[in-house]
Amino acid sequence: MAANATMATSGSARKRLLKEEDMTKVEFETSEEVDVTPTFDTMGLREDLLRGIYAYGFEKPSAIQQRAIKQIIKGRDVIAQSQSGTGKTATFSVSVLQCLDIQVRETQALILAPTRELAVQIQKGLLALGDYMNVQCHACIGGTNVGEDIRKLDYGQHVVAGTPGRVFDMIRRRSLRTRAIKMLVLDEADEMLNKGFKEQIYDVYRYLPPATQVVLISATLPHEILEMTNKFMTDPIRILVKRDELTLEGIKQFFVAVEREEWKFDTLCDLYDTLTITQAVIFCNTKRKVDWLTEKMREANFTVSSMHGDMPQKERESIMKEFRSGASRVLISTDVWARGLDVPQVSLIINYDLPNNRELYIHRIGRSGRYGRKGVAINFVKNDDIRILRDIEQYYSTQIDEMPMNVADLI
């Protein structure tokens, strides 16, 4: 097991990495030498899966995808220390889809996640990437009808993504048969342990065939996780992904000086035609501000959708579905959107409010240029926000220039 490497980087190293255009030069740590595969075409993936990857909007694999997908496909047990925003979900999703025998209508891969939302998101991602493969994939989560789970599992599912409690329940009821499972993925393993799922994870593992390949993704590697990897894994390869250096790459960042809060709205209206060139997300710091801005934009006859954490899950899902499909083009949101949700078409982010802490900045704008896409981020900055903007610049060793008149040409 490789020693737990430090996540910190010096200011000068951070600066060097941020300016680095070539993702293969991102500082990476692995427990052994790992080949870098710079394109999806050179990974040896099946043709119908490649079609799904490109149709989904991915163009170039992210740094973790360039390193981990080949290792997982080869059958290696893999520990990926990585946070959301690095492309981790697509890393294991592509690998899982590559390893399936579609002719066999039995569960061949099991993915455990800490929350229902994440499990559903993983399931939807698998169905989208596997669109040309005729893949069956079910989300097995608490809070839903048990009978429906049993019916779906009886029908036959190639992949099951779910929360540990419900998955174990389905295994115990013999509705989820484990004999054909080849791969177990533990996503956000540290979060699962924080939520008290340790027992259920071990219970699930005991029912899997002895030769099951294990892929574990975790932002941190505390003692309990390392204990789990020792029990579940054989000679795992460990890949550490440092996120902050990756995600400002290829993103042009600008600010617009607004003297007072009231002027932000007029500035946004002036920019609306630019927003709808592709798709845009507008971030506000509070739910109340999201509701207020949405109403004000609609009163001015602009088409926008909005989302925040107080909305019922069903409503959030349908808003995300509309946005993903391109039916809605401008989404106003709080930071609930900024973590782990992939919409490849988003190429413009507007910070109507600068984030309350500088770590959130990368969560927000890092998504606008992911997977080799370029992006633009525009920050609305009041006079008393200048200090915060400078702090963000310094923290990320980046440069945020005044927005040029021709910003539409850059998107």
UniProtKB/Swiss-Prot annotation:
GO CC terms, sorted: cytoplasm; exon-exon junction complex; nuclear speck; nucleus; U2-type catalytic step 1 spliceosome
Residues in cross-link Glycyl lysine isopeptide (Lys-Gly) (interchain with G-Cter in SUMO2): K19, K152, K314, K374, K382
Residues modified as Phosphothreonine: T163
Documented EC number(s): 3.6.4.13
Residues binding ATP: K60, Q65, G85, T86, G87, K88, T89, A90, D342, R367, S368, G369, R370, Y371
All residue ranges annotated as the Helicase ATP-binding domain in the record: 69-239
Residues modified as Phosphoserine: S10, S12
Localization: Nucleus; Nucleus speckle; Cytoplasm
Family the UniProt entry places it in: Belongs to the DEAD box helicase family. eIF4A subfamily.
Name under which the protein is recorded: Eukaryotic initiation factor 4A-III
Record organism: Mus musculus (Mouse)
Gene (UniProt): Eif4a3
